[in-house]
C-alpha cells in the first residue's frame, strides 16, 4: 500500500512517519515481511533500492564486479545528481530571493552531470550495462529536466535513455500512481 506524505503540509514531521524515517525525508518503506519474518523500516532511496534488490534478486547483480558498477552509479545519483539537481530546482524555482551565484553554480553543475551521464551512455542502454537499481534511482531526476533549465536535445544519449526507461511497463505503472 502507498501512503502519501505531503511535504507541503509537513506530513514528514508527524511522529508516526519519523519512526519510519528519522531524517523526515521521503521515500521510506515498511516491509511487513522483512528479515527473519519481522517488519523492517527502510529510509533513503538508495538503501531502499539496495534492500529490495537483495531481497528480490532483481536489478541488483550478485556478481561482485557488476554490483560495484551498479553501486558506483547509484552513489553518483545519491551524492551528485540528486542533490545538485535538487539545488538547481530550488534556487531556480523556489528560493524567496534570486541569488545569481547559486543559480549559475547549480545550473553549471547540472549541465556537467548531464554530460557525464551522456558520455556513460555512449554505446549502452543503461548506466551499468544492464537495467539496474541505478537506472531506477536516476530516472526521476531526469524527468524534471525542463525545470532544471536543461535543453535535453544537447544530451542525445540521455534523451534516448529517458525515452527507453519511460517505455518500460513497470515505469509507466509507477508514473501513473497518483499520490
Task: State where each predicted segment sits.
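GST superfamily/GST-like fold recognition
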Residues: 80, 85-89, 126-154, 159-165
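Active-site-flanking alpha-helical
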Residues: 53, 141-142, 175
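Residues at helix-coil transition
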Residues: 53-54, 122, 166-167
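Active-site rim elements
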Residues: 100-107, 125, 148-151
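Long hydrophobic alpha-helical segments typical of transmembrane helices together
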Residues: 158-179
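Surface-exposed helix-capping loop/turn segments at secondary-structure junctions
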Residues: 58, 119-130, 170-174
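GST-like domain detector, emphasizing the conserved glutathione-binding G-site
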Residues: 1-104, 108-111, 118
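Short, solvent-exposed turn/loop segments enriched in Gly/Ser/Thr/Pro and often Arg
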Residues: 6, 133, 178
Amino acid at each position: 500500500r502507498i501512503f502519501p506524505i505531503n511535504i507541503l503540509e509537513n506530513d514528514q514531521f508527524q511522529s508516526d512517519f519519523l519512526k519510519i524515517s528519522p531524517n523526515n525525508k521521503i521515500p521510506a518503506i515498511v516491509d511487513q515481511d522483512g528479515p527473519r519474518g519481522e517488519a523492517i523500516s527502510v529510509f533513503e532511496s538508495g538503501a531502499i533500492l539496495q534492500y529490495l534488490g537483495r531481497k528480490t534478486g532483481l536489478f541488483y547483480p550478485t556478481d561482485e564486479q557488476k554490483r560495484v558498477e551498479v553501486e558506483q552509479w547509484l552513489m553518483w545519483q545519491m551524492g551528485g545528481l540528486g542533490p545538485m539537481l535538487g539545488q538547481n530546482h530550488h534556487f531556480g524555482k523556489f528560493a524567496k530571493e534570486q541569488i545569481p551565484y547559486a543559480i549559475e553554480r547549480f545550473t553549471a553543475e547540472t549541465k556537467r552531470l548531464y554530460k557525464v551521464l551522456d558520455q556513460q551512455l555512449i554505446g549502452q542502454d543503461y548506466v551499468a550495462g544492464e537495467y539496474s537499481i541505478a537506472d531506477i534511482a536516476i530516472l526521476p531526476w531526469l524527468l524534471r529536466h525542463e525545470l532544471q533549465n536543461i535543453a535535453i536535445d544537447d544530451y542525445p544519449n540521455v534523451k534516448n535513455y529517458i525515452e527507453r526507461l519511460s517505455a518500460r511497463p513497470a515505469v509507466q505503472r509507477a508514473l501513473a500512481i497518483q499520490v
